């Protein structure tokens, strides 16, 4: 079943789509069992710290890298109900990038490599979160430029590998504070212009 069909089915059933963080192998196995038993779509939403490319040492969940995690889930997903999703992908969203204090060019290259692995390994929803900045001088225009670059890259790679993806975009760093209404409006208006 294709992603659009899964989502359409949920909309028509008037049910919400549950996203589960793959915090452990037990959580992954339980979620797969529930999706199979009740024939219902569920999303696995993995951060780069939980699951990432083998190029970055994988993630803390069961020592899985992107490819082995995807294979594990897809092999057990008897009714094709599980949707693999990337949560908070982007520069400096992996512990290795933070530890090495990668500069912007290096962090963007790393993020692109991670997204490429996601796309090749059947992740269907990609969260682009370009809000982090190691210098703590994150300007909304800088985040927009990084978002544009990553959005275009993901779109091109999905097209190249004949994969269908949906893209979610983050607008602010997760620090407990929030952007102003005007900042969010500015970000979204500019993102819509870019996408058109």
Feature roles, as predicted:
Residues 1-86, 93-94, 100-109, 113-116, ...:
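Alpha/beta catalytic barrel-like cores
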Residues 90, 94-196:
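Helix-rich catalytic cores of soluble enzyme domains
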């Amino acid at each position: 079943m294709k992603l659009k069909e899964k989502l359409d089915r949920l909309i028509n059933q008037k049910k919400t789509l549950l996203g589960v963080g793959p915090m452990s192998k037990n959580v992954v196995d339980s979620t797969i069992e529930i999706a199979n038993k009740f024939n219902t779509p569920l999303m696995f939403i993995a951060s780069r710290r939980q699951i990432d490319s083998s190029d970055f040492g994988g993630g803390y969940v069961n020592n899985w890298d992107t490819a082995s995690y995807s294979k594990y889930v897809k092999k057990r997903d008897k009714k094709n109900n599980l949707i693999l999703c990337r949560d908070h992908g982007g520069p400096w969203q992996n512990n290795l990038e933070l530890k090495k204090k990668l500069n912007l060019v290096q962090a963007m290259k790393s993020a692109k490599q991670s997204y490429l692995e996601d796309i090749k390994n059947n992740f269907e929803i990609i969260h682009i979160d370009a809000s982090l900045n190691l210098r703590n001088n994150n300007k909304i225009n800088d985040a927009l430029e990084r978002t544009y670059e990553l959005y275009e890259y993901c779109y091109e790679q999905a097209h190249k590998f004949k994969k269908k993806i949906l893209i979610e975009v983050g607008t602010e760093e997760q620090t407990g504070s929030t952007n102003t209404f005007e900042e969010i409006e500015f970000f979204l208006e500019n993102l819509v212009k870019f996408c058109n």
